[in-house]
Amino acid sequence: MEQPLGDMSPWHPDNHMDPEPPTKRRRFLADPDEASSDPVAHDSSPLPPSKRFFENEDETVPKTERLETIDEKPNNASPKSSSTELPTSQQEPSPSFDQETFETFIGDKVSEDVLSAIRSNCGNNIERAVNMYFDGTYKKFMKKSTRPAPPRPAASSSRTPNVSGERTIPIQTSKRMPNERYIGAFGVEGWATRSGTNLLKHGDIVKIERQKRAPPPTKSKGKAGPVTPSRGFGAPRRQDVVVRFTTQSGTEVGRLAREAANWVSALIDEKICRFEGTVVYAPERLRTNDTIFLQLRCSLLNSAFFSRPFQLADDRSAAFFNQNETNDEKTLRMRQVALVKLFQEINLHPTLTNSATKDGRKGLLQAAEQDEEKQKEVKKSDGNGTNNTKEANSSQSSDTEDGEELEQDQLDALYKKAQSFDFNTPEAEPADTFAMTLRKYQKQALHWMMAKEKDEKSHREPLMHPLWEQYEWPLKDVDENDLPQIEGQSKFYVNPYSGDLSLDFPVQEQHCLGGILADEMGLGKTIQMLSLVHTHRSEVALEARQSVVARSNVNQLTRLGKNSESILDAPCTTLVVAPMSLLSQWQSEAEKASKDGTMKTELYYGNEKSSNLQALCCASNAANAPDLVITSYGVVLSEFSSLAARNGDKSFHNGLFSLRFFRIIIDEAHHIKNRSSKTSKACYEISATHRWALTGTPIVNKLEDLFSLVRFLGVEPWNNFSFWRTFITVPFESGDFMRALDVVQTVLEPLVLRRTKDMKTPDGEPLVLLPPKQIEIVNVELSETERDVYNYIFNKAKRTFSQNVEAGTVMKAFTTIFAQILRLRQSCCHPILVRNRDIVADEVEAGAAADAAAGLADDMDLESLITSFTAVTDKASKESNQTFGAHALEQIRDEAENECPLCFEEPMNDQTVTGCWHSACKKCLLDYIKHQTDKAEVPRCFSCREPINKRDLFEVVRHDDDSDMMSKKPRISLQRVGVNASSAKVVALMSELRALRREHPKMKSVVFSQFTSFLSLIEPALTRANIKFLRLDGSMAQKARAAVLNEFTEKKGFTILLLSLRAGGVGLNLTSAGRVFMMDPWWSFAVEAQAIDRVHRMGQEAEVQVKRFVVKESVEERMLKVQERKKFIATSLGMMNDEEKKLQRIEDIKELLS
């Protein structure tokens, strides 16, 4: 037997911060010779039946839970001493009931009536008898013989009786919630941190305390001052969950075991509960690490019922890629788990709950366990490879998302129900103020949207919020003593998914009065929403519209009262939030769809923002309030950030967050698919009666994409992420895919209306009759110099990849390899994109001075050339070649259709003139010069034998579409071949555009590229060809964008719109164009298809032809294979585990660099 340790043992409270005792055999008996005098109290605790130490036959708690942490029993114990230990499994026989042994256990004599009640109900089991005595359950059996009463729970009074009958219990009452209120009691195990005799005895009261840890000292770092720890994420040190119990004098004698301390500490720290302990058993001679059993009385504090602050827009935010859990996330998780654990321990059950949440607690704990495991993995990976983490983080955007991705067939299955559109759905006619004619499917959508908005339940009895549970305050404590009651407060309410408590009945607010219009791109979502704005107006708006003439004073109108939150109702106004590039389109579409004077629109952006939106839109200004306020996601985020900086104080705010709009519409709603982004949280906070989300893709590739939309719409109870995670995310990540997908389908079905362009009506007709669309791949051959640049970058990237494969560091160097692949893609567009700009500028200057002596420029107007040569001809020294040159230029101007002297084609293809003014086809001349050069001969003119070179060749350019020319003959210019020749892709594009201009001189086209710098290189080529063009990219202000789109729509004649894929890939209506040129492929063709659908959409009347330029034998060709397999280079796929995802990324890179 081990010797007692002194007070200053290594496990003294001042020397150890871990709530777990040291790893050694615990002493449940003092010494063999002490067994008869020291009662074995580890099995004599007044604990509830749910606790593992003791059990009650009346409760359905598995016996296998008993003493699951007691691993060893004393050897060579006498029959009597062995009977004092609880069995650790059901196989061990239980000692029979014996009065002498029983009284030895409890350390007291009992009366005959108590002994009779215990003996008759313990089933001849000594353990059950001890339990019944200490937890007081024997009393209910005694009461049965005196007066009838409803049975009470064994361990505590936390199970409240049915309140259906009258109570005649004299209890103390008050009218105010006290600082704390008893809720129940439970048993816990602790361990001693001090040695001594008679330190604790049965029945002693101990204090349950948390010692506040001093903040770590700030470290000074030179002149920069102290370095403070980051507040955003949890510190890497071990978490402090130590819970101490002390005597009344304040002397610490022990700590709670870690299992209980984990959640008890959270309840104390969060100021939810206060605990008071009673010693059930402690050895008379206490030694460090001895087991002590306590009964904890728990009281809920008044502060637990306070609400949380404004900044927590979501119930919990997502952890970013490979980052630690934030302090707020950890606090919320521990608060949730602690409340669930507490109610389990005190055997407290709700008297009213939602049927959907009955099994939620198990899932909630499972979700918390998964989060905890993830955090352990993150900390482990942080410790093993910090550089790798930083590398990975740098490659991710600030909106990195969590959650596993869906396979395509799973995504299709999710949409199947939403797309099972009933073509017999009733139709609704738009209001007479609406100026457009809706198609049948659009009228059906209008009926569906109006039904969703008008589905109000104000006449029904208020229902409890589905996330909350109702509990009743106990009437008696664990010792059957009456508890003071609060008048009008017999119940309280708990939300286990958010950790909130309330004394007031949590009424379920009006369910979602809106939805998701998820029609495929090009089916007219904007028009359908505008028809809803016209058709469904509030009563205040209708009254204001009818009375605007009859009443001279707007103060005579019915008003909605102001509330104390500084949020005013805007009953006449619909707020539209859209990407900046779509603001002008919404405004113009609203004007087109409205009859004159029926729709007031307000652009709330930049300099156009109203100084006081609240005064403009409030009910008291109903007659003058705008019907439609259009703003951008950026403005919403900006105002939300300003409001958050004031801790949500709206008293000084008169912008978007100061109003409760009649309706809010977010366009391109996939902008908020990441629930943890600031933009998403800002949109959640906007107040509105009706909420709509417009997107062609409500789920992009993760289930969490849908959650963010559900959160925005306020769909109870799914807008709570803990609830969503419990019933959807956890089953999905645990492999129960069908269960999770079934639940998501039930969420989607009532919320989403989705139609696609390939749907057929019952008559077999397409839903929308669109003109045909042809997509053609144009293979581009790189020139020798371009191929040299490409090969150089390709070999460098391949070498880097091979080296990292050998070293096993591919994922660590993923960003570097990916950047080199990006360089490869840029070199396919134009070599200059990957070169130093200064070097390129020097080369341009040198080339410009090459022919200065001859006075020839790269671009020359033919008229000025003829004038120049005519002037020379008039001189006395009339040289024959100059005279012939003037004559040749006049022939070109007069469109003399001479045949090519080399290939004998008539007329010439891309007519080109030599320095000696002889003409031939451009290709013929270049091939002729190359043939001469290959034979090591000096190239000479095929006609006059003068020396020629590529730099002396000028291509004839006719400006056929020049509407400014008054002359019948178009202007003609010469452009030097070679100097102005751009990359192979630009040359191919210009060839297509020239051919298109000849065939369709009035055609409009859109040129897409993901590289804005490449668009800048296309501009000079268009200028030289005298092709009119406009440009729209992300760097332009909203007004400039609106002007460009308006000019492109209104402009007559051959026009090109240069558009960046990011700025113009979504939302825009470009049906005035008929041709699309995709200059470079994207990883997913879906992104390109989105851009193409800006042209091929409802309103398009002509056939749309799409040309996709792809460089042969390059990374672009291999990207098409990646597209065909529906893969993404930067993301993982489907149900792969982390290792499989890494391997898949490596395989993708191998294919791109093969």
UniProtKB/Swiss-Prot annotation:
Helicase C-terminal domain segment(s):
988-1144
Q: Can you provide one Gene Ontology molecular function annotated for this UniProt record?
A: DNA binding
Record's Pfam families? Answer: Helicase_C, HIRAN, SNF2-rel_dom, UBA_Rad5
Task: Return the InterPro entries for the record.
Answer: Helicase_ATP-bd, Helicase_C-like, HIRAN, P-loop_NTPase, SNF2-like_sf, SNF2/RAD54-like_C, SNF2_N, SNF2_RAD54_helicase_TF
The residues that the entry says bind ATP are: D519, E520, M521, G522, L523, G524, K525, T526
ZnF (RING-type) ranges: 900-945
Region of interest: Disordered: 1-98, 143-167, 211-235, 367-407
What does this gene product do?
A: Probable helicase, member of the UBC2/RAD6 epistasis group. Functions with DNA repair protein RAD18 in error-free postreplication DNA repair. Involved in the maintenance of wild-type rates of instability of simple repetitive sequences such as poly(GT) repeats. Seems to be involved in maintaining a balance which acts in favor of error-prone non-homologous joining during DNA double-strand breaks repairs.
| Family from the record | Belongs to the SNF2/RAD54 helicase family.
Q: What is this protein called?
A: DNA repair protein RAD5
